[in-house]
From Swiss-Prot:
Its main location: membrane. It is found in: Cell membrane. Binds 2 iron ions per subunit. It is a peripheral membrane protein. Its cofactor is Fe cation. This is 3-demethoxyubiquinol 3-hydroxylase. Keywords: Cell membrane, Iron, Membrane, Metal-binding, Monooxygenase, Oxidoreductase, Ubiquinone biosynthesis. Fe cation 1 binds at E66, E96, H99, E180. GO terms for molecular function: 3-demethoxyubiquinol 3-hydroxylase activity; metal ion binding. The gene is coq7. Its EC number is 1.14.99.60. Catalyzes the hydroxylation of 2-nonaprenyl-3-methyl-6-methoxy-1,4-benzoquinol during ubiquinone biosynthesis.
Length: 217
């Protein structure tokens, strides 16, 4: 993936090209992970067709979640007012790139593919991130906290509902969950603003729709 660096000093055209390249890398590329795959030392097992289909559906949801996280963070970083906030967002995005690569690897192992709607998921998340960022960095960080808490919840659900013998997927999700919790904690420490009640509910509803579609497509 294109090196993630602050964009504040770039010209408007440079920034547009950087954002376009990030979108292409996230949606259509195969970004390499900086950290080793957590499942590397976990032996694979033979899953029956139904188990494989279910595991692939869950990992596709998790892959979409990382596509959305990239869009959200890049949208927020593009309009961040404070250099420290922008750095925090881009640093979190880099770790989410690891998650994206790990989920893509696992989908390949399961003979499956990413969601056909990834361009839509990314565009919607980028727009949401930019809108949140325009309200102020405290709002932007508030969206980070709520997003990561909701992701933690669905990772817990997936850890429970994956096929019992699919330990490779579990190894990936456990590390992802640790990272997401840390991102939320760091955003809170950086001055995140609690979001008004209707916003988390709307985010949860949108997430439910995404998961329903991504599980199959």
């Amino acid at each position: 993936m294109t090196q993630i660096s602050p964009t504040r000093l770039h010209s408007p055209l440079d920034r547009l090209l950087v954002e376009a390249q990030r979108a292409l890398d996230t949606v259509f590329g195969n970004p390499p992970a900086e950290r080793p795959n957590p499942a590397a030392d976990t032996p694979d097992v033979v899953l029956d067709p139904e188990q494989r289909r279910h595991a692939a559906g869950l990992m596709r949801i998790n892959h979409v979640g990382e596509v959305c996280a990239q869009g959200l963070y890049f949208g927020q970083a593009a309009v961040a007012r404070d250099a420290h906030t922008q750095h925090h967002l881009l640093e979190a995005a880099q770790e989410e790139t690891d998650h994206l690569a790990w989920c893509a690897d696992r989908l390949h192992e399961l003979d499956s593919r990413p969601s056909l709607f990834n361009p839509v998921w990314y565009a919607g998340s980028y727009a949401l991130g930019a809108l949140a960022g325009l309200r102020g960095d405290d709002w932007s960080l508030g969206f980070v906290v709520e997003t990561e808490r909701q992701v933690e919840a669905h990772l817990d659900e997936h850890l429970e509902t994956l096929p019992q013998n699919d330990q490779r997927s579990r190894a990936i999700l456990r590390v992802m969950k640790i990272d997401e919790a840390r991102h939320a904690d760091q955003a809170e420490q950086a001055g995140a603003r609690p979001l008004p009640a209707p916003i988390p509910s709307a985010m949860a509803l949108a997430s439910k729709l995404m998961k329903t579609v991504a599980y199959r497509l």
